[in-house]
From Swiss-Prot:
Species in which this protein is naturally found: Borreliella burgdorferi (strain ATCC 35210 / DSM 4680 / CIP 102532 / B31)
Any GO CC annotation of this UniProt entry: membrane
Protein name (Swiss-Prot/TrEMBL): Uncharacterized protein BB_0044
Membrane topology classification: Single-pass membrane protein
UniProt keywords, alphabetically: Membrane, Transmembrane, Transmembrane helix
Length: 133
């Protein structure tokens, strides 16, 4: 039998070659797994978004916010100085809106679940058109 010498260079090159093969396989496998998991997450999010119910949204909104806490100061419609500034050379710059117009824009707390946005928008557009005539 012949005695073979231990060739360090030979084993080193084989180990480097195997490391490249294993790392390449691992890289391609991990990128495929990441793409699959990203697609699954996007599909799950899309499904959850479709399941969101607007009544639940309004219920959560009503639970978290007390509508009585909101205060927006109303304009003073009876202020004479304000009315004088609007008349320039006998022409009215802006026409005042009555106070009830602004009150109707508020969504009342008891009607929060029964809001029909399209109907409210149509009413608002009709009121604006009536005032602008």
């Amino acid at each position: 039998m012949q005695d073979r010498k231990f060739s360090f260079r030979k084993y080193f090159l084989i180990s480097v070659f195997l490391i490249f093969i294993v790392s390449g396989i691992t890289y391609f496998y991990s990128t495929q797994m990441l793409e699959k998991s990203q697609k699954c997450v996007e599909d799950n999010l899309d499904a959850k978004v479709k399941l969101v119910d607007m009544e639940d949204f309004y219920f959560d909104l009503n639970e978290c916010l007390n509508m009585d806490d909101f205060f927006i100061p109303r304009p003073d419609f009876l202020n004479e100085n304000l009315n004088k500034n609007l008349v320039v050379d006998g022409l009215i710059k802006n026409k005042f809106l009555d106070e009830n117009f602004f009150k109707d824009l508020w969504i009342k707390k008891e009607n929060l679940f029964n809001v029909d946005i399209e109907k409210e928008n149509e009413k608002l557009i009709d009121k604006i058109l009536e005032i602008s005539k």
